[in-house]
Structures are given as structure tokens and as C-alpha cells.
Amino acid sequence: MRIEHIPVGDNPPESLNVIIEVPTGGEPVKYEFDKASGALFVDRILHTPMRYPANYGFVPHTLSPDGDPLDALVIARSPFIPGCVVRARPIGVLNLEDEHGGDEKLICVPVDSTFPYYSDVGEREDLPRIVLQQIEHFFKHYKDLESEKWVRVGEWGDAAEARQITIEAIERAKQAKA
């Protein structure tokens, strides 16, 4: 995969491309794309017997404060295969801190033209409460058995905050390339 040729989205920060690394409900394996080669590597096998609560990936041509592309979860009724690109819109953000610093996770749903099931979801609060609880629980505990790794779950943010974080991550990536 030539990640450098995949745009941020067709209308960022409203509509973003998310490159999926881990499918919802998949085996407890953390995959990660090598941005230079485009190859999908096994980053690690989770030490906790937990499955990802949503399709997990990143937004290309963004840069988070931790030095990685902006992470995104895409809520959907189906798992997406690793390596696929999903057009999604951010509806919120979960602010985390881990051993590397701040680590925001965008919460997204597929754009209506891809899957209109979530067309009435404009904010994370529009999702069933249990979905948000599962996401928070997963990130609070998925590193529990890994030595020298930790996570602190912070506050949830709304769609406006998610869009602002995306704008800042796009700008940070542009500055890093300059």
C-alpha cells in the first residue's frame, strides 16, 4: 500500500479517510502499518485477552503529539479488513495519556454514502451508552499486563473537538514535512 498517495479525506475535518489496522472484534493482535514501506506488521499480541471494540486505524497525513498519525476508531456493525480505507466522519474523541504522552482516539462512523445506518449520529452521545463504555474499558485495560506500559483515560470530547484535533494534526504533519 502506498500510504503517501491516500489523501486525508475528501472534506477534512468533516470527512476523513481512515486506514484500518485492526478489525472490530478481531483477535487480540495489534497490527501497525509501516508508513515507509506500506507493509502491515504485527506490532504486538495483546497480553490481555481483549478484543478491539471498534475498527481501529489512523488518518493518513496527520501527526499526533506522540509522533504517530492520528488514531481513529470507526464504529460499524461489520469488521473491516486490515489495509482497507474507510471514509468516516468524526463524532467525538477519547483523550488518553500513555507512556508516550497524550494519545487521542477519534471516534468516527462511516460516511452516509458508505453506510447510512449512522446518519442520525452527529455526536458520540448519539451512540448507545454501552458502546462508549466498552471503548473506554478497552483502552483503560488493554495494556494492563504489559510491563512498563500504562494508560490513563481522560475526558471525552465532542465532534467539534475531534475536528479541531484533526485540523491540528494535519497542520503538524505539514510542518513536519517542511
Regions found by a protein language model. Name each.
Residues 1-178:
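Hydrophobic N-terminal alpha-helices or hydrophobic patches in metabolic proteins across all domains
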